[in-house]
Structure formats: C-alpha cells, structure tokens
Amino acid sequence: MKKPTKKTGIIVSSIGGVLSAVMIAGTIVAYSYQGLLDVTFQSSDYVASVGEKELCKNVAGEGAVLLKNENEALPLDNDETKLALIGQDSVDFVYGGSGSGSVDTATAPTLKSALEGAGYTINQTLWDFYDTGAGKDYRKKTPDMSGHGPFEVNEVPQSVYTTAVKESLKNDDVGIVVIGRSGGESADLPTSELSTGSYYLQIDQNEKDMLKMACDNFDKVIAIINANNPMELDFLEDETYKNVKAAFWLGGVGQEGMHAIPEILNGTTNPSGRLVDTYAYDSTSAPSFKNLGDYTINNSTVTNGNKYLVYGEGIYVGYKYYETRYEDVVLGNTSGYDYSTSVQFPFGYGLSYTTFEWSDFNVTEKEDAYEVTVKVKNKGDHAGKDVVEIYAQKPYTAGGVENASVELVGFTKTGVIKSRDSEIVKVEVKKKDLVSYDYKTNKTYIINKGDHYLSAGRNAHDALNNILALKGKSTSDGMTEDGDKNFAKMIFNQAEIDATTYSKSEVTGNAITNQFDDVDVNYYEDFTYLSRNDWTGTFPTTFKNGSWTATDKMLADLEFFDVTSDTTDDETINAFTYKSDFKDTTYKLPDVMELPYDDTKWDDLISQMTYTQMTKLIRLGGYATVQVDRIGLPKTIDKDGPSGISGTLVGGESTMAWPAEVVMASTWNAPMIQNLGVWFGEDSIAAGVVGVYGPGADIHRSPYSGRNFEYFSEDSMLSYQMAAHELRGLRSKGVLAYVKHFALNDQETNRYGSAIFANEQAIREIFFKGFEGAIVDGGANAAMAAMNRMGARWVGAHRGAMTNVLRDEWGFEGFVITDQASVPAMFYQDMISGLWAGCDMWLNTNESYWALSAYKEDKTMQYYITRSAKNIVYAIAHTWAVNDAYKTNTDGTISETTSKIFPWRALLWIVDCIIWVSAIGSSAFIWISYKKKPE
C-alpha cells in the first residue's frame, strides 16, 4: 500500500478540522436558538374552507371604493367582454405589503385568471408582453425587509411597446388600467422627488403616457387604483384622460380578493367601501409632512438614541386638519386656504352604482349615549349597501383645548337594500366619545364649554357642511356646496367646562391624569404645536431643521433608566414574599384558569415556578413561549400575522391571506371584520398557532408611512372599532392576538430607538385609540411594544404607557412583548427598566441573550419577574392551547391541530456523529499509515 503523502495528510487534517469547527459552531448556534427551532406546525394538508374564501373575497369587494363613475360606465355592459389589462401593475398586483405583515399569495389568482374565470376575454398579446415579453423587466421596486433598496414606480415606457402589442388593442372593448403602489416594513415611502421628477404618490410620466395610450385606443377606460397609501389622483379630472370614465380603489387584496374585481366590473358586487384616509391633491400638504424622515440628535452617543421626530401637528391628523381649516375660512376666522384645491376625495368618501336617499334624521338621548337614526332608501336600479357616518363637533375657544371641526364618533353599514326599498339604521354615539383631553390645565378628560353638534354625513366634508348649514352658512360664505341642516343637530350646550364626569376610568375606576408630560417636546424645549388659533403662525416646520442639540437632561434620559431611583412600588415589594425553587406543586394551570386575575391562587401557582423557569418564560418569547410542566403550562407557537398566518419562519404552512388592514377598514363593516377575526382564529387553531403578532393599531399619520397597509386608518374612531371587532373575533377562538406596535410607531424610518415627541392630547385622542379599542372593547390580552421611544425613553420602559394607562386605566390583563429582540442592535430595549415599567416578555430566540441570573437574590427584581410571569401565564391560560372550549368552529365541528414536528435535535446529533466519525477516522487512517513500515 502506498503511504499517503504529507500534503494529503495536511489536506485531510484540514478538512477534518474545518468540519469539526463547522459542527461546533452549528451546534452552538442551533442550541442558542433552540426556542425557535423547537416548533410544531400544522400538517401540509391545510385547505381553506369555501366560507373562508368567500369571506376574503367579500371583504375585498366591500372594501373597494368607487371614486368616479361618469355616465354609469360601471358596471360594464353585457357585450363589453373583451378587456385589455394595461400597465405593468396588472401583472404585478399588490396583494399585501412586505415585512412581517406580508402574506403568502403563491396560489392566489392573477387579475387575468380571475377575470377569465368570470367569463371575460383578456388580451393575451398584451398580457404576455407584460408577463414574459419586453415588459417583464419593468416592475415596482420596494426596499427589502432591512429597508435597503429603492422605491421605483418603473412603469413600462412607450418606447418598449411593439407595434404588434399596440395593434392588439383594436380587438378589445374596454381598457382596464392598473396603477399600483406598495410599501412595507423598515422603510417609509420616499418624501423627495424620484429620478422621474415626480413624487412616489404621484403618477409619473410613463404612467401618464400609458394612460394616454389607453385613452387613445378606448372610449371607455376603467382605472383600478391598487395602492395601500393614498395617491394623488388629479388625472381623473384631467381632460387629457377624459376617456377614463370610472375608477375604483382597492388596496392589498389578499388570497381571494382578486375575485371581487370581476364582480365589481359586472355589477354582481355594488361597491360600498369608503375611504379611510383623506386624498389630497398634494400629498405633501398635510402638516405631518414637515416632520417625517431622518432627524438626528447631534450630540447623543447613546446606542439607538440619536434620532428623533416631533408630531408638530398635534391633533390635526388627516381630515381633522383639512376640514377644520375649511370651517375656519367659512366662519371668517382665517383666510388663505382653499379647500376645493386641497382635497380631492374627503375622508369617508365613496360612490355607488345606485342612489341612496336619506331622510328622518333623529337624535335621541339615552343615559350614556345618543341614538342616531336615519332612513336610507334606494332610489336607483341596483341593489346595494350604504354607509351612514356620524360626526361630532365639539366647541373650540381660541387659546383653549384644541378641537377639530368634525370627528367621527359612529357609523354603520346597511344590509343589501333592493331597488326602491329602504332601511332605518341606528348608530349609537357614546357620550364619553364627546370628550377632549386637557393636558395643560385640568390634566384629564373634559366636556368643553359651548355648543355640541352631531351630524350624519356621506363623508367628513358632507357632515361638516350640514353643521355649517345649521349655523346659517352657505356657498356665499365660502362653502364648497350647500349643506343640509336637516342632518345636523345641536345636542347640548355645556355652560361650564366639566372636568369631573370623565376624570376616572370607566373600566377600573382609577383617576385619569397626565402620564406623558415627558413625551411632550416642551419637557426639554419650548415649542408650539399646530393650533387653529393661528394656522399660519403655528404651521409646523421641521423641528430644529433636522439636527437637534439636546439638553443635558435629555441626554441623561436617553440612557437606561435606573429603577432603583423609583419608589412607586416600594410598599408592594416590601410586602412581597418570594418563594424560591418551590418543590411542591399544589396547582396546575387548569385548576385556576377560570379564576379572576386577582385571585390569590394565581400567585400560589406562579410561586411553584423556579426562578429559571420564570426568567426563561420572560427572556425567550420569540415566536414561541416556553413550556413549564411544573404548572401545566404548554409550549405555544406565535407567528407574524396582521393579515393571516404566514409560513415564513423555519418551516410551517400558510393559511388564508386576508386583505390588508386598510382594505378591512374600508369596508366600514365592523361585524364583517369581527367575522374575519373568527375565521382567522380557526385558521390559527388549524395551524397550531396560539399567538398572532397583530393586528396593527397604529395610525396613518402620513400618506408616506411604509406600513400604512398594516394599520387601519388616519382616523382614531375607525381604528378603535376595527381593532375592537377583529380582536373580538380572534379572542372568541382563544387566540393570543398581540395588538401592535404600542405606541407612536407611525413611521418606519429610524424606528430602532427614535425619540418620538407628541402632546398628551394627541397621544390619547389620536395615537392610542386603536389600542384602546382592541383592549377595552376587544378583550386583547397581549400587546407588542414598539421599538421607538416615547420621549427619551424606550416605549417598553415607559411606565406611563405600559402600566398607568394600559393596565390602570384600560384594565388590561395580560402581557406585553417587545418587538424583535434577538440581535444585539436591540439591546437598547432594556430588560430591567422594561420589567419595572410593565413590559413582560422579550421577542428573543437566543438562549445566551438577556440573562437575569444576576438578579436571583434581588427582591425588587424578584417581584417584577414574578409579576411578569403571572401576566404571561394568565394570558396563555385564556387561549385554545389550554381551554378546549375555544375549538368549536363556526360550522359546529371541533377543530383539531394536526402537528408536524421538526426533529432538528436528532438530525443534528446524526450529522455531528457523522462529522466526528469522519474526522476521527480520517485522522486515524493517516496516523496509522504513517506509522506502518513499508512492506
């Protein structure tokens, strides 16, 4: 036998060494993330039910908003069956958004297949041009999950179209133009001009040319606006594109929503959606636009603590700015503002294929509410649904508490009303929704002095015009059109400010007072928020021009909070007795799960957990919660899921991808969204998923937020109701729905630790409302803390938010988890101050991170750790993982989870053994070969 050469020995030894190193490193990584890898997913035979698919389609159908319908261009005539789908967005339709809110639509229908399935003939030459021909190189571009990459519209230039493609249009009856925009996590839409010379929310030159091509070839063009953010749509009024006879908006359609489009075109579905955002002619005209983007605290060296953002607009978000400024012009309080050139489509706007006549408006006072009734009659030929929107006007006194001219306080959607039939609708307006938050003087909720109005309107502008008509105003005073005073009523006059009636929580009875003085930028610098007392003088500019030299106090506050300096809990902690490493197990979770949170048996149960078990429950909450056999706590799986459970994590299957939240809200059909929550919950059980990271309840503060698709609306009341109803559905199935991102996470740029400043009135009346609805009316028992700061302090460590409002005012009984905490960049989400404030769990999958072993003998931390463990266990006890009562499906059957376990440990051991044996065997072979004497 030939003796191996020295070179061979070196090579074999090196390979063995490398394999051993890889094995060791891989094993360390695997065990560091064992909490993430120890997962159980549904089996691959999941199939959505017929009812679920129908609901997904119907949500998209009811969420579609008809913007224009000149000469009844829609629905299409029966002989208009040959359609040309024009624009690259026709083959690159927006189904959702990117990031954690993305959904798996791999099996979703295309626009072409959906239309063909409904009997339409689609121009194949044009489709192939976009899909596989020269047009395929043109697609929308958006940044990746990390926020890297450009936003590009990338419509196909006219120069790329061949003669054959353009000639093919002559064979079609109607042109269907699709204009799309998308967004996603980690990046906001660009607020500066693109290389094309237009803003992202404007149509660019290539799109204009594409529209011109469509209008040159067709007498009837239908535009589909497939965008989750409100675009500038002035082309709908441009004579150049006069053949665009109809247009409707429809955002991310989800898995089955595409099937709603042919039904809208043929009239099977009569559009009944209403806009959830104001559509301005100039998307940069909103006061929030002046404070969007990347701003730096130039003298801060704190990790993830050198960025800031000031909500200078105060309460004047969306229509609350545009409509209020309009009223002040009509009342003669200001000038220099033209509503008709500012707003194209007001909040709440939407057309129908039929005409609805309203009458018999009436307001009846009840004990805690007003009941508003309206008779709705269908005067047209198409059956359809209508939306009745109720708005309030609260009095404003110059220099006093800010109040918008109108704000939504209730709404309802009719059933299907047949031609010539009518329906009387009732809307309850709670008296508590007529309050304002006075953060300067009374520091609580007040009923302001003066006249209070209610108005029924087809949109916010219509409702305001009705109030103005009741005040005696008309077009001669500058109104855009005369209102109808018969749909407005002055419901009461408040003689003096009432700062008592609503100064205590209706849920807990605790006093309500300021919690966010430190979030107001005036805590550090003098600043004036936008006020209707002086629109021009207080209109926001970019705070500190984007570069802020912070005070020493603020720099200190950006650092980790020293919990030992706080004495709030001293009395409770002194009375607390920590039972370490208890050996007896008197109770198991099923023994106490029906008991109220304050029952002492819960404390007895938690005291049976060891310190290590409690801290693992807190530290390792990424996509799963740990199992604790000692108390009968099962392991649970959590998934991203604002719009449905996605199978993007280490394996697993996908379930129904629902339309984007912005589409859900556009239905203005709260019971429908509650039903969606029920189906979503049944999906979760079928998938073996207990916790869902969603829904999102932040606000569309600006048209440019990248994640607007994942949130409901610019309006606080609509967000409140949609979040509440979706949560009711999810909770009815025992799903742990983590309402997110609490709070002030209304911008993606610099979300890692950015210091967000706002006044307390805006925080409570605007930015907290969606979360309040999810918790107070929806029963949410889990929430996700945002990555940003409230003021100088990370949200999860802000006690005012985490405990004083969330628990002491809203009665929240559950736990708060952080956003992503599995990488060192997230270590600013300090666990010690977070536990003190009321954050309970870290979304972490790495066993070596967030160690708490050093605090085992620290009584203060023992208390906070035990409290958080209780919050977590209590919430999980109220899920389908523990309580089988949640598993009864809508059809009466019992849902069973079919598990598929990924045996990664066994596989890792086998691979390790093979590598070890190979390495040892190779080395031994070389060694023996060298030692052998030549034959």
Regions found by a protein language model. Name each.
Residues M1-D438, I446-A456, A460, T508-E935:
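Glycoside hydrolase catalytic-domain context in secreted enzymes
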Residues K431-S503:
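Terminal connector regions
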